[in-house]
């Protein structure tokens, strides 16, 4: 039976206690170096956690001068040379060690060239260690790791996972408590110490003997799995559809050029062929309205242009044509407002006319005593005027 544990940052005060526990007999949680030359004059030792090779400065060999250190692993493709600092060599770059490495030290003894070698091996029976270690950063906030129990693992095997940053500090740790079932999953909720690279190692312990470890060095950007794009909207008119979205939240710092998007729309009819369009450096896409109108859905997913992997699809959104008809209630309200405005305008106009007439009454005309007399016949008056 397997189980999963959450990983948390281990306080420094508890780190020493953990190391002393790991060094108890019968455990193999701590990677231990081995050397075929126990009588080496330098007494070489290698710390896999810090990638530091040390030796005794006060050797019995006399005047010893170390000029360089080299680590080699043909299986892992490792070949690095560094210069010593004091009585140690530090291999700055992280490296996977489960294939085993050979450490060579070059120098002089009393002026004569000398060479020393230390072999670091992965102790334990083949197939006892974990396999298929995979880790992912999801939702821009937590690290999820999983592995598979080794095919030849002892019945009482218990696995532990450690995640270290490039300086050798613990980012997270997951261990099975005594009596718990074997664990093959872990989740780390605090990634504040995680840098651009991470060293992942799954160790095992068993009362039956040593258990091989499994480790890997990964670029943290390669671990991130993008979530679905945010704020996806879709609308159509009689000729075109428009889809817009926002990039997903990310743990790593990404720019607009780092994103690419894939837009897919498909009819709801069984057996219909989906249409896909790749969008780069944009968060909007317009395309002709698919026929027949209605019954289509669209979804969007994001990808990292550098890591060449795609994230999760957004929920499907229907592609529906916008209703261009004016609602009846809105039409009634607009008509009522127009009538009211006309009535108000007419009322204001009439009132202004009445006020103007009162302020400026009409000037009466000059009356003619003869022509304006209603008792005078106009025809008779014309004849009288025309007579000489």
Curated annotation (Swiss-Prot):
Residue intervals annotated with topology Cytoplasmic: 349-388
TM segment ranges: 328-348
Compartments annotated for it: namely: Membrane
Residues annotated as domain Fibronectin type-III: 228-324
Topology term for the membrane: Single-pass type I membrane protein
- Which Pfam families does this entry report, sorted A to Z? IL3Ra_N (PF18611), IL6Ra-bind (PF09240)
Motif Box 1 motif located where?
359-367
Give the positions annotated as glycosylation sites: 43, 63, 106, 132, 165, 237
User: Which Gene Ontology BP terms does the record give?
Assistant: cellular response to granulocyte macrophage colony-stimulating factor stimulus
Where does it primarily localize? Answer: membrane
InterPro entries linked: FN3_dom (IPR003961), FN3_sf (IPR036116), Ig-like_fold (IPR013783), IL3Ra_N (IPR040907), Short_hematopoietin_rcpt_2_CS (IPR003532), TypeI_recpt_CBD (IPR015321)
Signal sequence region? 1-29
Q: Does the keyword Signal apply?
A: yes
Task: Look up keyword Protease and say if it applies.
Answer: no
Q: Which UniProt keywords apply?
A: Glycoprotein, Membrane, Receptor, Signal, Transmembrane, Transmembrane helix
Molecular-function GO term, any one? cytokine receptor activity
What does the entry note on its domains? The WSXWS motif appears to be necessary for proper protein folding and thereby efficient intracellular transport and cell-surface receptor binding.
Q: What does this protein do?
A: Low affinity receptor for granulocyte-macrophage colony-stimulating factor. Transduces a signal that results in the proliferation, differentiation, and functional activation of hematopoietic cells.
User: What's this protein's family per the entry?
Assistant: Belongs to the type I cytokine receptor family. Type 5 subfamily.
Return the PANTHER family for the record: CYTOKINE RECEPTOR (PTHR23037), INTERLEUKIN 5 RECEPTOR SUBUNIT ALPHA (PTHR23037:SF46)
Q: What is this protein called?
A: Granulocyte-macrophage colony-stimulating factor receptor subunit alpha
Source species of the chain: Mus musculus (Mouse)
């Amino acid at each position: 039976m397997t189980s999963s544990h959450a990983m948390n940052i281990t306080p420094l005060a508890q780190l020493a206690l953990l190391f002393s526990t790991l060094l108890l007999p019968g455990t193999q949680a701590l990677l231990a170096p081995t050397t075929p030359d126990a009588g080496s004059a330098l007494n070489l030792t290698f710390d896999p956690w810090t990638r530091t090779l040390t030796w005794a400065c006060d050797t019995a060999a006399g005047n010893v001068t170390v000029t360089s250190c080299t680590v080699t692993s043909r299986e892992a493709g490792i070949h690095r040379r560094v210069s010593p600092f004091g009585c140690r060599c530090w291999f700055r770059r992280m490296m996977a060690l489960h294939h085993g490495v050979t450490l060579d030290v070059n120098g002089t003894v009393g002026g004569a060239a000398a060479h020393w070698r230390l072999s670091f091996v992965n102790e334990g029976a083949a197939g006892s260690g974990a396999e298929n270690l995979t880790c992912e950063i999801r939702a821009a906030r937590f690290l999820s790791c999983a592995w598979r129990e080794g095919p030849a693992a002892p019945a009482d095997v218990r696995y532990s996972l450690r995640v270290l940053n490039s300086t050798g500090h613990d980012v997270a740790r997951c261990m099975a408590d005594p009596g718990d079932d074997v664990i093959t999953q872990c989740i780390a909720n605090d990634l504040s110490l995680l840098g651009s690279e991470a060293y992942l190692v799954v160790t095992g312990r068993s009362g039956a003997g040593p258990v091989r470890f499994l480790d890997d060095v990964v670029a943290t950007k390669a671990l991130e799995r993008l979530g679905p794009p945010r704020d996806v909207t879709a609308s159509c008119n009689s000729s075109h559809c428009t889809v817009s979205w926002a990039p997903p939240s990310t743990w790593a710092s990404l720019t607009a050029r780092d994103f690419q998007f894939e837009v897919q729309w498909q009819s709801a009819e069984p057996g219909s062929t989906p249409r896909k369009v790749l969008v780069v450096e944009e968060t909007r896409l317009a395309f002709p309205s698919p026929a027949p109108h209605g019954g289509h859905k669209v979804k969007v997913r994001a990808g990292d242009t550098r890591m060449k992997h795609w994230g999760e699809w957004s929920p499907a959104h229907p592609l529906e044509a916008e209703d261009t008809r004016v609602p009846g209630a809105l039409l009634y309200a607009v008509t009522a407002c127009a009538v009211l405005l006309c009535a108000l305008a007419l009322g204001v106009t009439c009132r202004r006319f009445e006020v103007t007439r009162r302020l400026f009454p009409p000037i009466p005309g000059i009356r003619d005593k003869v022509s304006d007399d209603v008792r005078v016949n106009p025809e008779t008056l014309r004849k009288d005027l025309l007579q000489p």
